[in-house]
């Protein structure tokens, strides 16, 4: 039997070398891709929390101007939870298609009737409790996990701490 001198194809060693190179690339690339995906999820959560604060601010200011602020402590979507303190669920501020998001926004008024907006929110991957606009810019205020947060204003309380001017203005 005569062997032809023009062989075509790859040897087993060449194929194994390619597989090893691809494995090394995957080992290096996968953690970076996973970290990028997690950062994107956290960024999306932060944007949704800011949207909730914005919607609550708009809803509260409209109701305040129209004289229709919540007076009922039994309405769970928008309720008065204390003197100069109000709570709005996500549904109460128009975020009805919220998917996995659960939470609420509290609005507290100081003696000058300047409002402070604080969001308590989870999507079961991340959570934040009582955060203002400024707090959301600090990654330490966004935790992993649900934090036991519900969609109900039943456990909502108003903070007595004095926020900075930017927090009061919602910037």
Predicted regions mapped to residue ranges:
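N-terminal secretory signal peptides that target proteins for export/translocation
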Residues: 1-5
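N-terminal single-pass transmembrane signal-anchor helix
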Residues: 7-34
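Sec-dependent signal peptide cleavage junction
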Residues: 30-45
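Membrane-proximal N-terminal amphipathic helix
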Residues: 41-66
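Extracellular/periplasmic head regions of type IV pilus-like filament subunits
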Residues: 64-132, 142-143, 158, 170
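Short, low-complexity, Pro/Ser/Thr/Gly-rich segments in the mature regions of secreted, periplasmic
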Residues: 140-171
């Amino acid at each position: 039997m005569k062997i032809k001198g023009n062989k075509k194809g790859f040897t087993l060693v060449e194929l194994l070398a390619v597989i090893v190179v691809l494995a090394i690339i995957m080992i290096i690339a996968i953690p970076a891709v996973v970290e990028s995906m997690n950062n994107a999820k956290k960024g999306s959560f932060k944007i949704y929390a800011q949207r909730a604060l914005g919607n609550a601010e708009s809803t509260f200011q409209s109701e305040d101007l129209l004289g229709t602020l919540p007076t009922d402590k039994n309405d769970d979507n928008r309720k008065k939870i204390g003197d100069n303190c109000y709570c709005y669920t996500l549904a109460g501020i128009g975020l009805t298609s919220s998917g996995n998001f659960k939470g609420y926004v509290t609005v507290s008024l100081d003696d000058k009737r300047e409002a402070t907006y604080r969001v308590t929110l989870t999507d079961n991957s991340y959570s934040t409790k009582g955060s203002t606009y400024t707090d959301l810019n600090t990654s330490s205020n966004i935790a992993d996990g649900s934090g036991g947060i519900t969609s109900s204003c039943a456990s909502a309380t108003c903070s007595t701490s004095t926020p900075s001017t930017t927090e009061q203005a919602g910037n």
